């Protein structure tokens, strides 16, 4: 689920994804009137388990990156720009049918991989380089080994060596990792995966935010409660929620801090200063319930 003023009428609307490969719909805010919110179709077959909600074309409004599971394409959907406009425009990133087009594809990110000033689209097997005109089709793909099935993929120079690294977390197993980029002898980068933590499994959502106001980006994630009901490693473990304090350096570290042990996360969650006290809070909805974690004063 995501929230934005889709039709530019001054009221926030709700964007909802069904099961991977199912419909993506936005619900129009009725402006405090009674009754059900009117649903409008964005896409009939939206794939990838963690679609990205980011500003692709730098117009100040978030767009959607996902796959078209029926057409076997990776696409981005431009959000409406005019007042009372409801049309989403579809642009193809990749026509390669076997590359991140499965409805249950795990792993998607958005960030500048080659330091050219343009954000790229990242999957676990590589990344598509953003053209200057993001509406162009068939972005150039660069193969890379960015680990196992994961959720959100975060582009971040973790070891402060001037290039882009990638952080990811396991969706249905144990593991949170950072993938170190280093120069290769043939001019192509090499990737080496380092484990950050394996305290819990099923970390099916990952967010970066400065939790302790030290100027450094920390990691927030947790265990997705009943991700596959049973069957995943650690399925019966406690539904924990953690933040990992980033300690920068050539060998970066992330110090774990337990927030809660009876909530966990869902496919997505929100880190935001809800009560305007200058400290980020956390909002979660999953199969265990709906939770608001207010960050207390030290």
Regions found by a protein language model. Name each.
Residues 1-298:
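Beta-propeller-forming repeat regions
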């Amino acid at each position: 689920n995501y929230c934005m003023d889709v039709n530019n009428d001054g009221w926030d609307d709700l964007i909802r994804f069904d099961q991977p490969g199912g419909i993506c719909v936005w619900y129009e805010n009725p402006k405090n009137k009674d009754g059900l919110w009117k649903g409008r179709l964005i896409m009939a077959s939206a794939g990838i388990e963690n679609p990205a909600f980011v500003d692709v074309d730098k117009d100040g409004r978030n767009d959607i990156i996902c796959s078209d599971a029926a057409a076997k394409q990776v696409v981005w959907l431009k959000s409406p720009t005019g007042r009372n406009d409801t049309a989403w425009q579809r642009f193809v990133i990749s026509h390669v049918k076997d590359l991140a087009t499965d409805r249950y594809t795990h792993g998607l990110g958005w960030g500048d991989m080659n330091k050219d000033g343009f954000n790229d689209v990242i999957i676990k097997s590589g990344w598509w380089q953003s053209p200057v005109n993001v509406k162009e089709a068939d972005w150039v793909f660069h193969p890379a080994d960015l680990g196992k099935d994961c959720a959100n993929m975060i582009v971040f120079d973790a070891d402060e060596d001037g290039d882009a690294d990638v952080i990811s977390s396991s969706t249905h197993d144990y593991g949170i990792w950072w993938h170190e980029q280093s120069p290769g002898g043939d001019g192509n980068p090499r990737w080496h995966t380092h484990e950050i933590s394996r305290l819990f499994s099923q970390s099916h959502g990952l967010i970066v935010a400065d939790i302790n106001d030290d100027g450094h980006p920390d990691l927030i994630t947790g265990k997705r409660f009943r991700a596959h009901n049973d069957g995943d490693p650690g399925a019966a473990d406690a539904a924990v929620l953690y933040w990992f304090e980033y300690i920068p350096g050539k060998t970066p570290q992330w110090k774990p801090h337990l927030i809660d042990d009876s909530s966990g996360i869902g496919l997505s969650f929100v880190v935001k200063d809800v009560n305007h006290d200058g400290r980020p809070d956390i909002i979660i909805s999953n199969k265990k319930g709906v939770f608001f974690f207010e960050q207390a004063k030290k």
